[in-house]
Amino acid sequence: MNRLLDENQRRLLKIKNVMARKRVEFHRQEWFRYKKLGDAWRKPRGKHSKLREHLARRPPVVDAGFRSPSAVRGMHPSGYYEVLIHNVNELESVDPRFQAVRIASSVGSRKRQEIIKRSEELNLKVLNGR
């Protein structure tokens, strides 16, 4: 947990993490019926759509009430903001008090080791160090 968060931000971050665990998966209307549809969310717009009208016994619809608190939106559960890193030089611009490093998936193992070594020297938190 990031120690520089004030009490209100810590409280909101706990709420955000609890909400994230409870949040349901939103599926597209009739995603189970046709394989070609996929399950990615699409807003129901049909004139007679039961899902659009929020009738009973229907899955939940995306709504503003499912969002996390705005003060901690975009934060990692540890309380840091993530910064995507592709090479060692990008580590210099990271603020260790508020930001944590996530190494890009396109980075190979040799460069990954260099990034991890340099981030330890700079006291940076690596989220996917392995």
Curated annotation (Swiss-Prot):
Q: Would you say which domain of life the source belongs to?
A: Archaea
A Pfam family (short name) is Ribosomal_L32e
GO BP of this protein:
translation
- A GO MF label: structural constituent of ribosome
GO cellular-component term (any):
cytosolic large ribosomal subunit
What does the UniProt keyword field contain? Answer: Ribonucleoprotein, Ribosomal protein
Q: Which family does it belong to?
A: Belongs to the eukaryotic ribosomal protein eL32 family.
**Name of the featured protein:** Large ribosomal subunit protein eL32
Instruction: Supply the gene name.
Output: rpl32e
